[in-house]
Amino acid sequence: MCPARSLLLVATLVLLDYLSLARNLSVATPGPEMFPCLHHSQNLLKAACNTLQKARQILEFYPCTSEEIDHEDITKDKTSTVEACLPLELIKNESCLNSRETSVITNGSCLASRKTSFMMALCLRSIYEDLKIYQVEFKTMNAKLLMDPKRQIFLDQNILGVIDELMQALNFNSETVPQKSSLEEPDFYKTKIKLCILLHAFKIRAVTIDRVMSYLNAS
């Protein structure tokens, strides 16, 4: 494993561990400010887990378990959710604190107040960009799966719906990601393997998003 990937993995594990601890120590009742996005993130995680479980059952003769697949992060070099959502308590570079405390105005419904810190806005925007990338990938893959004469598996509207709901709650304007199209005849076996890889990666990202929302709600 290359040093950069190892460093990112360590940072991700530290963030998840810290956010998990913060959530366990916090009051269970969600605060009114972050409740909308916390609710949406919980739905997102539930949909991600259910969709992955269903895919593993349907594709039981395919390499679709966590141990069998080649893990891939499609958001790599495109977003920086782990870094942007790192709690201030874990930041060692004090020169960054002033910019992190700067207030900005947001348009999303995640916060009761549209005024939030620069770093919280950056964190939420990065989550939005993650969701947008996965949304495009899922739609592209679903279009291929629907072409399969066997109609063995395809994504239902639930997972696409919860992604869209959280994106609407975050409400960031950004460039449209074009949906990929190919003139080649789709390889349905490879597409189903790719679906497994994508669902495993999305579940991990959904866990991160849910823990970030829980932490923000508690703080």
UniProtKB/Swiss-Prot annotation:
Main location: secreted
Keywords: Cytokine, Disulfide bond, Glycoprotein, Growth factor, Secreted, Signal
Keyword Membrane part of the UniProt annotation: no
Gene Ontology terms for molecular function: cytokine activity; growth factor activity; interleukin-12 receptor binding
Bridged cysteine pairs (disulfide): C37-C110, C64-C196, C85-C123
Superkingdom in the source lineage: Eukaryota
Residues with glycosylation annotation: N24, N93, N107
Biological processes, Gene Ontology terms: immune response
Annotated localization: Secreted
Signal peptide (UniProt feature, chain positions): 1-22
GO CC terms: extracellular space
InterPro entries per UniProt: 4_helix_cytokine-like_core (IPR009079), IL-12 (IPR050676), IL-12_alpha (IPR004281)
UniProt record similarity statement: Belongs to the IL-6 superfamily.
Protein function: Heterodimerizes with IL12B to form the IL-12 cytokine or with EBI3/IL27B to form the IL-35 cytokine. IL-12 is primarily produced by professional antigen-presenting cells (APCs) such as B-cells and dendritic cells (DCs) as well as macrophages and granulocytes and regulates T-cell and natural killer-cell responses, induces the production of interferon-gamma (IFN-gamma), favors the differentiation of T-helper 1 (Th1) cells and is an important link between innate resistance and adaptive immunity.
Self-association state and partner proteins as the record states: Heterodimer with IL12B; disulfide-linked. This heterodimer is known as interleukin IL-12. Heterodimer with EBI3/IL27B; not disulfide-linked. This heterodimer is known as interleukin IL-35. Interacts with NBR1; this interaction promotes IL-12 secretion.
Protein name per the record: Interleukin-12 subunit alpha
